[in-house]
């Protein structure tokens, strides 16, 4: 998900039907640019549109640059390339010797170490070498998130249906074939570790495929704005452009309801860890839909449409794309 954006247009939207489904997410109240927190819930609501499904709308006017809300991930997972340099739970970059180690992984704080104990107890019972090699060889990132979610479910930290409310991606037959390979490796790792049948009863091929389909279209790539002390800012920027700056990926509940626009009025950023911050890019009026850009908004029209079609399954019809800008 890109943080780059332009801001030009305001929009009018179709009639809404407010969602009554309870949402599984953690978010804070909004604050202004000076960081003063306001009393009450975030100034947004989730509704349904006739054309784009779920959407997020402002319940009052929100100023340019204001924090809309924050959100903690339902599941977050570090990149295999970053296992030695970021916190195993929150993905914060580790600062030299200031880290806490437990069974071969590192954390930024004792709090993260304690909060990870449940799923780490499950994870360390199994041998993941074949599964990790499979992900590393094919450069797969989302199966690693499923692995972590499975460990969280077995430990009781998450219910097996925690992502069911999210929209799934449409998977090709080729993708499904590759998914089956990953499922077999994941299932065998738990089976060989002698987990009870009741503990892994949820882990069917159907569940695995459905979870991957949801993670694939809803996962955010975590590019941290704040680096470790002493890191060269130019190097950080170059790594981000090349895609090497990502510390991992995460799935959120409320941020996943934001629709896309190539000229968004909001964006999502990560300052120091996987806790997401949604900010406005310009003034937003009461009742206006809040939209973010799923990709690099600096790309040309054809490139944007290709990536959105292949990666997210839709062609963008925002005002910017209508003008083929």
From Swiss-Prot:
Catalytic activities: L-lysyl-[histone] + S-adenosyl-L-methionine = N(6)-methyl-L-lysyl-[histone] + S-adenosyl-L-homocysteine + H(+)
GO biological process: methylation
A GO MF term: histone methyltransferase activity
SMART domains: SET
Stretch forming the signal peptide: 1-30
Domain SET: 42-295
Disulphide bonds in the chain: none
A GO cellular component annotation in the UniProt record: nucleus
Family membership: Belongs to the class V-like SAM-binding methyltransferase superfamily. Histone-lysine methyltransferase family. TRX/MLL subfamily.
Function: Histone methyltransferase.
Protein name: Histone-lysine N-methyltransferase ATXR4
Species of the source: Arabidopsis thaliana (Mouse-ear cress)
């Amino acid at each position: 998900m890109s943080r780059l954006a332009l801001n030009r247009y305001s929009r009018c939207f179709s009639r809404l039907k407010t969602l009554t489904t309870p949402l599984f997410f953690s978010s804070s109240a909004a604050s202004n640019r000076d960081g003063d927190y306001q009393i009450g819930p975030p100034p947004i609501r989730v509704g349904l549109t006739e054309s784009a499904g779920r959407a997020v709308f402002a319940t009052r006017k929100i100023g340019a640059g204001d924090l809309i809300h924050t959100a903690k991930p339902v599941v977050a997972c570090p990149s295999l390339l970053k296992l030695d340099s970021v916190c195993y739970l929150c993905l914060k970059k580790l600062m030299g010797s200031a880290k806490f180690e437990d069974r071969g992984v590192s954390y930024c704080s004792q709090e993260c170490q304690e909060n990870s104990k449940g799923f780490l107890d499950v994870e360390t019972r199994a041998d993941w070498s074949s599964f990790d090699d499979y992900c590393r060889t094919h450069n797969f990132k989302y199966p690693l998130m499923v692995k972590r979610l499975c460990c969280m479910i077995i430990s009781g930290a998450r219910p097996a249906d925690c992502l069911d409310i999210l929209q799934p991606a449409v998977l090709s037959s080729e993708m499904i074939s590759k998914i089956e390979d990953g499922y077999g490796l994941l299932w065998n790792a738990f089976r060989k570790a002698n987990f009870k049948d009741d503990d892994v009863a949820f882990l069917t091929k159907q569940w695995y495929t459905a979870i991957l389909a949801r993670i694939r279209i809803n996962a955010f790539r975590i590019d941290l704005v704040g680096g470790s002390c002493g890191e060269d800012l130019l190097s950080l920027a170059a790594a981000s452009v090349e895609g090497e700056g990502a510390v991992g990926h995460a799935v959120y509940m409320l941020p996943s309801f934001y629709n896309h626009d190539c000229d968004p009025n909001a964006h999502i950023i990560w300052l120091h860890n996987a806790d997401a911050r949604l900010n406005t890019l310009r003034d937003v009026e009461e009742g206006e839909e809040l939209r973010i850009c799923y990709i690099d908004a600096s790309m040309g029209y054809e490139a944007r449409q290709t990536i959105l079609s292949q990666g997210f399954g839709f062609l963008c019809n925002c005002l910017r794309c209508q003008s083929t800008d």
